[in-house]
């Protein structure tokens, strides 16, 4: 296993001129992540990221499985959308999102089985291009408001030299604590992903960016990273 020693943490500026300073309200910081029950029905909008909306690849009456692509686009700035439950497509229709955007959506009624798609298998990564393709096929997008497709972020232009990977664990919005819980509960998954990115994309330096109200999260990540370097 390739390893990397974390170089540091980017802390939020303690005093910012202007703006509105609201309470953090991180009341869920000590609550473990829980798995929600399987819903009876899901509505999957085809616009879940910045860029070109997906086109539905299924129709009403189709049987679908977990992980099956139900929407895709051949445009670069886009990412496929997968079924989150198994069941039957009950409708392909227009839907209005919380932000007022009107888009096509795939409605699936659950069969309660959460059956995995037969075509699901670990990606065969042999280099940079196959890795970026795997990221794209996974449908990964950012958790920010834009939902920026991850494969686009990771594709460095050939005329650019990027030597530092900054992993964003900052949560500037009040109430949100998902990044913090991920750092505590899935620290090795985060670090192993960092190792993979460093090795395949050739980063020389890695920094995890976090506010100074997350000392425990960074302490856990740094301890595991330092231990792995020592064992290597």
Language model features: what each stretch is:
Residues 54-63, 67:
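Short histidine-centered loop motifs in beta-beta connectors
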Residues 25, 35, 45-48, 61-62, ...:
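Generic alpha-helix detector with strongest preference for long hydrophobic helices that associate
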Residues 1-57, 107:
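N-terminal, Lys/Arg-enriched amphipathic/low-complexity engagement segments
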Residues 74:
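Cationic-aromatic interfacial patches
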Residues 77-232:
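Iron-sulfur-associated redox domains of electron-transfer enzymes in respiratory
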Residues 65, 71, 90-91:
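Hydrophobic beta-strand signal
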């Amino acid at each position: 296993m390739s390893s990397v020693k974390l170089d540091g943490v980017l802390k939020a500026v303690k005093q910012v001129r202007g703006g509105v300073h609201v309470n953090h309200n991180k009341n869920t910081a000590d609550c473990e992540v829980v798995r929600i029950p399987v819903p009876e029905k899901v509505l999957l909008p085809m616009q879940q990221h910045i860029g070109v909306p997906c086109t539905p690849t299924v129709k009403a009456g189709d049987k679908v499985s977990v992980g099956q692509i139900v929407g895709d686009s051949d445009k670069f700035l886009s990412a496929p959308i997968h079924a989150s439950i198994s069941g039957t497509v009950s409708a392909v229709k227009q839907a209005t999102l919380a932000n007022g955007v009107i888009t096509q959506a795939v409605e699936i009624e659950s069969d309660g089985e959460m059956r995995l798609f037969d075509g699901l298998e670990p990606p065969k990564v042999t280099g940079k291009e196959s890795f970026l393709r795997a990221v794209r096929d996974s449908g990964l997008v950012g958790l920010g408001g834009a939902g920026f497709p991850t494969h686009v972020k990771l594709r460095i232009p050939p005329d650019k030299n990027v030597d530092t990977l900054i992993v964003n664990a900052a949560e500037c919005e009040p109430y949100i604590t998902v990044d913090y819980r991920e750092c505590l509960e899935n620290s090795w998954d985060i670090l192993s992903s960092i190792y993979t990115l460093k090795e395949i994309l050739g980063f020389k330096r890695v920094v995890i960016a976090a506010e100074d109200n997350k000392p425990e999260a960074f302490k856990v990540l740094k301890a595991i990273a330092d231990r792995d370097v020592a064992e290597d």
